[in-house]
Amino acid sequence: MTVGVLALQGAFIEHETMLQGLGVATLQVRLPEQLVQVERLIIPGGESTTIGKLLVRFDLLEPIQQRAAEGMPIWGTCAGMILLAKEIAEGRVEGQPALGLMDITARRNAFGRQVDSFETNLQVPVLGEAPFHAVFIRAPQIDKVGEAVETLASLDDGRIVAARQGKLLATAFHPELTGDARFHELFLGL
């Protein structure tokens, strides 16, 4: 199995390092011809408007949507989660492309600016009893989930920060910045 990591902007190298530590082959995806070579795709954190525009510029938006329709597992972290969302709480920036694959409403920068970034331990039942140490950097949150979406983790105040819909996975935080590979293992099992 080869896992693609969208490598247009953002924390793609950290995802590759985590996957390679699990013995999984990776490929940086920048072009449609690279997308056809992978069985799964991670869309990393970064800046969602920039990544969305680059998806269009490099002719990847529709091919990713098509691969998702064919059942390819896709995981979006932070900005990647925003790109997966069907809806954005405060609306999309004018002209902002998005994949719109997952029946969630995401809210950008839900916790504030860069200075408000934080780390916390989350209870994630699908990962077992041990808490998952999550890193939130200018993180979004999920305001609303559709009927087919399973909430995987919430903060103590109830804000949803991880969800799954079929073979789509979304995390508001950055599992690739921790030494804990459990979310990567979960994704590999989708």
From Swiss-Prot:
Signal peptide: none
Enzyme nomenclature, EC number: 4.3.3.6, 3.5.1.2
DNA repair listed as a keyword: no
PROSITE patterns: PDXT_SNO_1, PDXT_SNO_2
Lineage: superkingdom: Bacteria
Keyword Flavoprotein set for record: no
GO BP of this protein: glutamine catabolic process; pyridoxal phosphate biosynthetic process; pyridoxine metabolic process
Active-site residues, record numbering mapped to chain: C78 (nucleophile), H174 (charge relay system), E176 (charge relay system)
Keywords: Glutamine amidotransferase, Hydrolase, Lyase, Pyridoxal phosphate
Binding, L-glutamine: G46, E47, S48, R108, I137, R138
Pathway the protein contributes to: Cofactor biosynthesis; pyridoxal 5'-phosphate biosynthesis
GO function term, MF aspect, one: glutaminase activity
One GO location term (cellular component): cytosol
Catalytic activity entry: aldehydo-D-ribose 5-phosphate + D-glyceraldehyde 3-phosphate + L-glutamine = pyridoxal 5'-phosphate + L-glutamate + phosphate + 3 H2O + H(+); L-glutamine + H2O = L-glutamate + NH4(+)
One Pfam family named in its UniProt record: SNO
Role summary: Catalyzes the hydrolysis of glutamine to glutamate and ammonia as part of the biosynthesis of pyridoxal 5'-phosphate. The resulting ammonia molecule is channeled to the active site of PdxS.
Cross-referenced HAMAP family: PdxT
Quaternary state and interactors: In the presence of PdxS, forms a dodecamer of heterodimers. Only shows activity in the heterodimer.
Similarity-based family: Belongs to the glutaminase PdxT/SNO family.
NCBIfam families recorded: PLP_synth_Pdx2
Identification of the protein by name: Pyridoxal 5'-phosphate synthase subunit PdxT
Species in which this protein is naturally found: Herpetosiphon aurantiacus (strain ATCC 23779 / DSM 785 / 114-95)
The organism's taxonomic lineage, starting at the top: Bacteria, Bacillati, Chloroflexota, Chloroflexia, Herpetosiphonales
Gene name of this polypeptide: pdxT
